[in-house]
């Protein structure tokens, strides 16, 4: 029998859910409202307003305190059930959202819709705005996602789609466990049995079926191990200089796999791309022997010798087939927005930019780039490696020009032969080949790092990428062992440091041949009254770091003899070897008068925020990966009344200052301080690092440093 009929909506209903405590019912539909009802009395308790589109789905958290709603306005909203207050709006989706579900423990929230993705957020206990970060954005189906449901143990997530497929996911890693047989019609209702490994699926044709739910422990739950973009260099001992390597001249014909010119490696091959005997083009093949795991740097020297040839190199097997290097599995799709991207620029605007994490790889028509810095807002570009200069390409791909609207894919690299479950997006195979050096050191000449997958004979094919040829199209092909190394250069020498303030300097590393480890720069022997942040550490894979030289308010003017005592060294490790290099000096540093504005970077704690510490004993701000911390910027206005723009530098890669906009941090006129929030990406390793603030006025005055301590979630925060 019908117990109650609840009336109140002005249009058709799309979602009705009962709270876990059995007290309330929530309903939503095309009238863009959500209504909460008392189940016992049938009385309407309150109407939740805020959506600008139809409400398609609802989900209560297990404690019945929070309600989540999915809407055609492209947002998920979190609501306080007791008060009806909107707590947060999750707006990462660019298309309509059809479904939403809390995990059984209430810590995660999953949603899906028209853009074929399943997004998962980590939900705080309060659900307040800013405390519910996006954790996962997973391309899930080739057509819109209609329904999602968690298994009671929280280990399994089930999704259905307009592609008529039901997919079973590992809820933690979002890897596919299995894909069930194609259904007769769209599955618009899903429910996982509370005690048995099965689920009920309701189809659009009015039929309901019971399906077996695969057990959680399956082979596909084994985590896939991605590859690094840097090969761990092997130590081959002392290597001959380039001019000492044996040289061999090509012997034509050598265009076919059966006709290569033999090359003893390490060695240098001398060739010419020229046509003869009526051939339309010329390709030179060189043969060399390698053992499994052997590492070789293969590069050309042509444009640097003023040759017109634009080389391309490819590594082939003995039969002439391309040797695959790795697999790139697409996990999210995107595209270039706003404007095209040339082959040099680091900045680009990509669709779904808020889902792009730092260090994500993006595949663009054969080029692989790596995300370095998130966009500072919708009107800014996302930045890709390196920190400065022209864009780098990874895995020895070549930088190219990309058109507006060109498809892009966030990809994860895996070894050749890895079994990758189908997720509806492509898997790209990268071969050992290169046109222009992706690290931008050789100009239009080619370079790649080859690691032999098996013992045997390999071929290197050299050609002109344009198909041109001529008698003067000469080149050198160099095959040599890696020689990991680095040099460090200091910029910002010879500054004038104002009394009681500081000036910034930068140390830049030039890395060579697979050297990717940290580089520690130490500064010793400063004059009395001066202090420098030391050591300054260039993080693994990065190319620069910043430090501060400060002068005490009562520092005496230094002499040239004082600065002659200052020494700067850079130290790095490769395997069991320690490499020490001298760095150019700070130069002659002058002591300037007290500046018009002083900058202070302090803990965000009223009890000790104003307490100044000695430069060698900086205060410590502690942060946990995946969370936030705060600190305070304070300025002393001595003779400066205008607004002050500030930047915070030398934070660990993966820790950013939130919500700073295009112009950095601003302290308006008549104000002297501002609290800033630091956000730490989940993958940032434990470390300690000095960072500082720079006021972009009065000669760029710099604060004394704070120390940031990144700790693991299990380590106590001190």
Predicted regions and their residues:
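Residue-level detector of Asp-centered blade-edge/turn motifs that repeat once per structural unit
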Residues: 20-21, 62-63, 104-105, 152-153, ...
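WD40-repeat beta-propellers
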Residues: 1, 34-37, 76-79, 118-122, ...
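Acidic, Ser/Thr/Pro-rich low-complexity intrinsically disordered segments
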Residues: 255, 264-474, 478-526, 530-533, ...
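WD40/WD-repeat beta-propeller blade N-cap
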Residues: 7-13, 49-55, 91-97, 138-145, ...
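Conserved strand-to-loop turn within each blade of WD40 beta-propeller repeats
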Residues: 28-31, 70-73, 112-115, 160-163, ...
């Amino acid at each position: 029998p019908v117990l109650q009929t609840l009336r109140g909506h002005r249009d058709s209903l799309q979602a009705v859910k009962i709270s876990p405590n059995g007290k309330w019912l929530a309903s939503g539909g095309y009238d863009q409202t959500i209504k909460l009802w008392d189940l016992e009395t049938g009385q309407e308790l309150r109407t939740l307003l805020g959506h600008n589109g139809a409400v398609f789905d609802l989900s209560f958290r297990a404690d019945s305190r929070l309600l989540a709603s999915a809407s055609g306005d492209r947002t998920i909203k979190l609501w306080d059930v007791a008060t009806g207050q909107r707590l947060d709006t999750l707006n990462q989706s660019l298309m309509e959202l059809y479904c939403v579900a809390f995990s059984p423990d209430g810590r995660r929230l999953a949603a899906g819709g028209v853009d074929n993705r399943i997004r998962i957020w980590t939900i705080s206990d309060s659900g307040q705005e800013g405390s519910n970060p996006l954790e996962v954005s997973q391309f899930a189906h080739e057509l819109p996602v209609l329904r999602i449901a968690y298994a009671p143990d929280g280990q399994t997530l089930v999704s259905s789609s307009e592609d008529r497929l039901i997919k079973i996911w590992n809820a933690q890693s979002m890897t596919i466990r299995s894909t069930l047989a194609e259904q007769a019609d769209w599955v618009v209702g899903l429910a996982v049995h509370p005690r048995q490994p099965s689920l009920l699926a309701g189809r659009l044709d009015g039929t309901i079926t019971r399906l077996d739910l695969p057990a959680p422990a399956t082979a596909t739950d084994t985590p896939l191990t991605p590859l690094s973009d840097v090969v761990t260099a092997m130590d081959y001992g002392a290597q001959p200089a380039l001019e000492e390597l044996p040289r061999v001249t090509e012997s034509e014909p050598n265009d076919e796999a059966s006709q290569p010119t033999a090359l003893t490696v390490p060695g240098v091959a001398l060739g010419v791309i020229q046509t003869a005997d009526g051939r339309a083009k010329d390709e030179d093949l060189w043969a060399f022997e390698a053992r499994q795991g052997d590492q070789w740097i293969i590069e050309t020297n042509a444009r640097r010798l003023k040759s017109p040839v634009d080389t391309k190199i490819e590594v082939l097997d003995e039969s002439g087939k391309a040797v695959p290097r790795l697999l790139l599995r697409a996990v999210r799709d995107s595209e270039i927005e706003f404007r095209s991207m040339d082959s040099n620029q680091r900045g680009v605007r990509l669709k779904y930019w808020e889902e792009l994490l730092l260090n994500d790889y993006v595949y663009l028509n054969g080029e692989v780039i790596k995300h370095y810095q998130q966009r500072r807002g919708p009107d800014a570009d996302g930045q890709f490696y390196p920190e400065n200069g022209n864009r780098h390409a990874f895995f020895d791909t070549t930088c190219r020009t990309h058109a507006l609207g060109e498809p892009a894919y966030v990809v994860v690299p895996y070894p050749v032969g890895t079994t990758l479950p189908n997720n509806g997006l492509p898997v790209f195979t990268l071969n050992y080949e290169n046109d222009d050096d992706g690290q931008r050191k050789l100009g239009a000449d080619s370079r790649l790092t080859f690691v032999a997958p098996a013992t045997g004979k390999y071929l290197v094919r050299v050609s002109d990428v344009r198909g041109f040829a001529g008698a003067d199209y000469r080149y050198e092909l160099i095959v040599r062992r890696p020689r990991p190394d680095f040099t460090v250069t200091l910029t910002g020498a010879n500054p004038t440091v104002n009394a009681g303030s500081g000036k910034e300097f930068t140390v830049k590393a030039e890395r060579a041949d697979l050297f990717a480890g940290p580089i520690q720069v130490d500064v010793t022997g400063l004059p009395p009254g001066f202090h420098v942040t030391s050591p300054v550490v260039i993080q693994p894979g990065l190319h620069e770091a910043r430090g501060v030289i400060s002068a005490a308010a009562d520092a005496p003017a230094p002499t040239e003899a004082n600065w002659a005592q200052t020494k700067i060294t850079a130290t790095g490790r490769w395997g069991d070897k320690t490499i020490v290099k001298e760095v150019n000096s700070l130069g002659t540093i002058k002591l300037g008068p007290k500046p018009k504005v002083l900058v202070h970077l302090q803990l965000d704690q009223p009890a000790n925020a104003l307490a100044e510490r000695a430069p060698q004993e900086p205060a410590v701000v502690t942060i946990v990966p995946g969370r936030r911390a705060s600190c305070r910027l304070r300025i002393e206005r001595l003779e400066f009344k205008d607004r002050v723009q500030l930047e915070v530098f030398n934070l660990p890669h993966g820790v950013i200052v939130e919500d700073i906009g295009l112009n950095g941090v601003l302290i308006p006129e008549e104000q002297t301080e501002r609290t800033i929030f630091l956000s730490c990406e989940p993958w940032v390793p434990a470390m300690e690092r000095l960072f500082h603030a720079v006021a972009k006025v009065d000669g760029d005055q710099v604060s004394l440093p704070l120390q940031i301590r990144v700790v693991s979630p299990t380590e106590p925060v001190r």
